[in-house]
UniProtKB/Swiss-Prot annotation:
This is ATP synthase F(0) complex subunit 8. Belongs to the ATPase protein 8 family. The gene is MT-ATP8. One of its GO terms (cellular component) is proton-transporting ATP synthase complex. It is a single-pass membrane protein.
């Protein structure tokens, strides 16, 4: 039964991890961060949906009263 050749695994793992770290650094350096973050008012974040003003009730078929 032939043995598994693991002589190149160290090089492969090392180069892969180096590549992942390098790409992560590139992503972080090109990302634009806000220079002066300020808290937002929570009231301005409310979305107005058309169904908010309506009262609706949905019934499941098994929850109906059976007489």
């Amino acid at each position: 039964m032939p043995q598994l050749d693991t002589s190149t695994w160290f090089t492969t793992i090392l180069s892969t991890s180096f590549s992942i770290i390098h790409r992560l650094q590139l992503k972080l350096t090109t990302h634009i961060f806000s220079p002066n973050p300020t808290p937002k008012d929570l009231k301005t974040l409310k979305h107005h949906n058309p169904w908010d003003k309506k009262w609706t009730k949905s019934y499941l078929p098994l929850s109906l009263h059976q007489h």
